[in-house]
Amino acid sequence: MKNQLNFNIVSDEELAEVNGGSLQYVMSAGPYTWYKDTRTGKTICKQTIDTASYTFGVMAEGWGKTFH
């Protein structure tokens, strides 16, 4: 499917060059990772693992611990 809205996908490094800051890793919890924008000081949350993969991973880990 063609991108009809003409969005450009940029990496964090490219975005840092455009806005004058960079994203610094803060922490990860579950399928989410938090970054801090060094220019604005705002904390940004990105989902870095899809929900289904994370859920199945948690279930598999629990089953593995239960039956070991």
From Swiss-Prot:
It is found in: Secreted. One of its GO terms (cellular component) is extracellular region. Keywords: Antibiotic, Antimicrobial, Bacteriocin, Plasmid, Secreted. It comes from the Bacteria. GO terms for biological process: defense response to bacterium; killing of cells of another organism. Its main location: secreted. Signal peptide: none annotated. Pfam families: Lactococcin (PF04369). Residues 1-21 form a propeptide. Kills Lactococci by dissipating the membrane potential of the cells. This is Bacteriocin lactococcin-B.
